[in-house]
């Protein structure tokens, strides 16, 4: 049995700035670091090929020395909204209702939610209570593709069913101000938030 994607939609968060407007925040963050290291980091941000950055929080909040718990609370609130808006757009494009979905897969590796975002979507969109759920977490960049593969396998095993895959990420929620590792820096330089 063949499986096909009926629609794709995205939802970006409301906070956005051009990279040139983020550089002053990066310079402040880098104060106290070795000059050569600072130049390297600035070059990385400027050369990342990312002209506009989207975030679930304003740049001032991202670079604020707040706890992981505080940022994760913002993550929970905002990614639920992004995921819901993205799913609603995709369902509308496909002329489907939330109750038409038999299998929901949510993908995220940038925050911690229990229950996961799929449970919130089922309630907020009044999806069927017998829907099959699969939260895919901690898989990094391969998670979105994995979610699509899981959906394909489910649909091939269950003809005439429908699945929704929602990938939502917010690396700004996991940005650690005290962490000057290249992993944290590269993540901040190249990744953005959205669903």
Model regions: which residues?
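Conserved active-site "lid/cap" helical segment
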Residues: 1-102
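A sequence-level detector of short, solvent-exposed, charge-rich linear segments
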Residues: 24-27, 41, 45, 59-64, ...
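Acyl-thioester C-C bond-transforming condensing/cleaving domain
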Residues: 77, 84, 88-98, 110-195
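Short glycine-rich or small-residue beta-strand-to-loop segments that form or flank ligand, phosphate
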Residues: 102-108
């Amino acid at each position: 049995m063949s499986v096909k994607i009926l629609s794709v939609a995205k939802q970006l968060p409301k906070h956005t700035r051009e990279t040139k407007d983020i550089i002053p925040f990066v310079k402040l963050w880098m104060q106290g670091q070795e000059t050569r290291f600072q130049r390297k980091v600035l070059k990385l941000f400027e050369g990342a090929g990312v002209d506009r950055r989207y975030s679930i929080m304003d740049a001032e909040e991202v670079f604020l020395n707040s706890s992981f718990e505080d940022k994760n609370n913002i993550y929970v609130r905002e990614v639920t909204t992004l995921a819901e808006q993205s799913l609603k757009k995709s369902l509308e494009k496909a002329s489907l209702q939330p109750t038409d979905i038999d299998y929901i897969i949510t993908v995220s590796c940038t925050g911690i939610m229990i229950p996961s975002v799929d449970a919130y979507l089922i309630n907020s969109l009044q999806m069927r209570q017998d829907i099959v759920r699969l939260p895919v977490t901690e898989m990094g960049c391969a998670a979105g593709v994995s979610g699509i593969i899981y959906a394909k396998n489910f649909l091939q095993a269950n003809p005439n069913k429908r699945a929704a895959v929602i990938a939502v990420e917010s690396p700004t929620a996991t940005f650690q101000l005290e962490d000057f590792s290249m992993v944290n820096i590269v993540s901040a330089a190249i990744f953005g938030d959205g669903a």
